[in-house]
């Protein structure tokens, strides 16, 4: 079978007094039988409530991750403050009194609305279209055994892992849910990880006490037709993308940056810094819950800089940070309890994607320097860089190539170029047998014409 995915729009549901809006996001899966290539046949069409994040097919089983908001029409996520509130001075005690009174009343009304809901009103649903009819499938048992919610969280969305068998004649699926923010997704051959911010942006704003943290939720996907929740943990900082996560021999490695949102309203906001943390599965002695506990860490990577790219290769991690110049960090993660920095290289520009060519070489794509002294970033061109890491304690940059085919020396011309491969790994195609790299460049040149008399 062939699986096609696409997006659909708003869903409404009928109530006694008419129609009401249910959700704005649907992910559609179409299962197509292509055994007869001249006459492909649509076997099944499924619509899952939630926005599509990613999917992977292994041996006839597809796992897809979606994220849906809890859309509750009668619940207010704002305060209906009276007009007089806005006329008061910011530090007027009456202003705070009005706000607290309205907030309390809103919470009471929201509680009544939530208490009146059925479970099916909250959780995502699956719709199957077949023979002109639409049937609804549940994504939960009544005991909510397939749900996990962080103990300290202000999140209002549901991330769902939908495990679908493609070869079965009848619809067969398994589903797991995390109550949380929109996640990043990482998967190895045996482990799937959802990484989501532990704070809600609305409440994090102007909140001096909220820490930048990331929740990590892990699932065993070693069995072809099942997804099993195996535990959760939390690390400080925020995760850049899926390449900042890696599982190797049962150890989860995570690279994060703290302080990058710069709480400008604070006099002593924490400085920006990056770290690498290793975690291993364990069981909480008090609750019996499956958890991820910290095994080791490397702190203080490039104070004042944030992470721009990460890549793991077995027992090594490569991290690029940047403020005015690009340090490449080589870290030994062979010992989970004692990850160690092996080497560091400061070079102009920055790498946004790292591709290990071999144990001794890295190929990266990113931006070159803007200034003659090697500082800043030249956003008008894409740069490829080759690094020699044969000696991990002394990495070197062996070559660079600036991709800007539209450069002009004409005085009144300016140009820029970029490549999708600088932020989308699927656009970075390296073919090892021929040592060939293919990246899609986009370029633009503006020439100003002058009239002469």
What are the residue ranges of the model-derived segments?
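Beta-sheet-rich non-transmembrane sensory/scaffold domains
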Residues: 1, 6-448, 453
């Amino acid at each position: 079978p062939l699986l096609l995915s696409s997006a659909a729009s708003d869903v409404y549901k009928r109530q006694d007094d008419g129609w009401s809006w249910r959700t704005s996001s649907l992910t559609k899966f179409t299962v197509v039988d292509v055994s007869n290539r001249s006459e492909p046949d649509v076997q099944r069409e499924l619509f899952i409530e939630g926005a599509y994040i990613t999917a992977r097919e292994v041996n006839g089983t597809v796992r897809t991750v979606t994220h849906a908001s809890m859309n509750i029409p009668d619940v207010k996520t704002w305060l209906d403050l009276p007009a007089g509130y806005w006329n008061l001075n910011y530090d007027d005690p009456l202003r705070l009194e009005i706000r607290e009174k309205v907030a309390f009343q809103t919470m009471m009304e929201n509680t009544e609305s939530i208490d009146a809901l059925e479970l099916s009103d909250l959780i995502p649903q699956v719709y199957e279209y077949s023979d002109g009819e639409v049937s609804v499938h549940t994504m939960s048992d009544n005991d909510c055994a397939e749900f996990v919610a962080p103990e300290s969280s202000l999140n209002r969305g549901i991330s769902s892992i939908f495990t679908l068998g493609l070869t079965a004649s009848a619809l067969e699926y398994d589903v797991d849910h995390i109550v949380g923010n929109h996640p990043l997704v990482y998967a190895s051959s045996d482990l799937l990880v959802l990484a989501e911010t532990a704070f809600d942006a609305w409440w994090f704003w102007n909140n001096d006490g909220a820490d930048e943290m990331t929740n990590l939720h892990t699932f065993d996907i070693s069995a072809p037709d099942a997804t099993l929740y195996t535990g959760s943990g939390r690390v400080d900082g925020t995760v850049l993308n899926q390449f900042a996560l890696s599982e190797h021999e049962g150890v989860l490695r995570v690279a994060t940056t703290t302080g990058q949102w710069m709480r400008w309203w604070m006099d002593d906001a924490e400085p920006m810094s990056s770290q690498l943390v290793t975690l291993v599965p364990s069981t909480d002695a008090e609750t019996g819950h499956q958890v991820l506990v910290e095994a080791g860490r490397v702190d203080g990577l490039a104070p004042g800089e944030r992470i721009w790219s990460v890549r793991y290769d077995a027992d090594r991690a490569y991290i690029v940070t940047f403020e005015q110049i690009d340090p490449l960090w080589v870290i030994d993660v062979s010992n989970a309890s004692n990850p160690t920095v092996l080497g560091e290289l400061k070079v102009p520009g920055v790498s946004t994607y790292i591709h290990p060519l071999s144990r001794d070489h890295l190929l990266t794509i990113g931006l070159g320097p803007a200034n003659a002294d090697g500082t800043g970033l030249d956003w008008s061109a894409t740069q490829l860089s080759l690094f020699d890491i044969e000696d991990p304690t002394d990495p070197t940059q062996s070559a660079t190539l600036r991709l800007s085919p539209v450069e002009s020396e004409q005085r009144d011309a300016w140009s820029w170029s970029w490549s999708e491969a600088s932020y989308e790994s699927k656009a970075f195609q390296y073919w090892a047998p021929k040592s060939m790299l293919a990246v899609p460049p986009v370029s633009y040149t503006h020439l100003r014409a002058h009239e002469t008399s």
